[in-house]
Amino acid sequence: MLDKLSQTEHLDRDELYNCIESMFDMSSKVRVYRHLTDYSGNYDEVYNEYAVLNLKEVEQKLADYYLDHVLLEETKDIEHLYYVPKVVTTYLKCEALKALVYNHLGQKVYATDKCGQSDFVIFDDSAVLLLDFTPEGALKGGFLSTLPDDVKYVSDVYDEYRQGAVDYLKRVPCETSTKNGLNRKINQLKSSLNLK
């Protein structure tokens, strides 16, 4: 996505966090898109990692930062989208993410099998931040653009994936994401893999 933007300013991690904090305070509407990738290459490990709410020390928490703060700011209009990379494993991973976000953060989750390539945040349709991660998933920094054309492009991409998520969820059977339901899925998964 970065190569589609006309003009960006590179920010290191500290600059990115400072920028986010100041922009968030000034914003009435923030849209967060999170491109969730299995950085380890191991689907089962990632599923269990999210299911038991153990995020380890991976600095992939920028969207969570917003969600945590948004819960304290009921006037904020937040929309967010989680990407699920492989269709064949989408159902279980979607359920784990639903439990993580809905039960613990009070937010609904959308999941889509489309790939946006980037995590990004849009502030009031006037600025966009793209997040820059290492291959292991650590947050390095980001790119900021306030050009109207850039913001519109990213907003259009966001809307495209949001619609994709809505269409996708219509095809996925829904199940209440309770702790018991999630534990049952984990046990089923472990049994199928002969894990203890």
Name each model-derived stretch.
Residues 113-148:
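HKD (HxKxxxxD) catalytic microenvironment of the phospholipase D
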Residues 86-117:
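HKD-type phospholipase D/PLD-like phosphodiesterase module
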Residues 42-47, 89-93, 117-122, 182:
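Short, solvent-exposed polar/charged micro-motifs at secondary-structure junctions
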Residues 1-86:
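PLD-like (HKD) phosphodiesterase/transphosphatidyltransferase domain
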Residues 31-36, 79-82, 110-112, 121-123, ...:
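A structural signal for short, well-ordered beta-strand segments and their strand-loop junctions
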Residues 134-196:
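Signature of lipid phosphatidyltransferase scaffolds
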Residues 24-25, 99, 169-170:
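Contiguous, function-dense segments enriched for cysteine-driven chemistry
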Residues 41-44, 87-91, 129-131, 137-138:
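Short catalytic/ligand-binding loop motif for oxyanion handling, primarily in non-cytosolic enzymes
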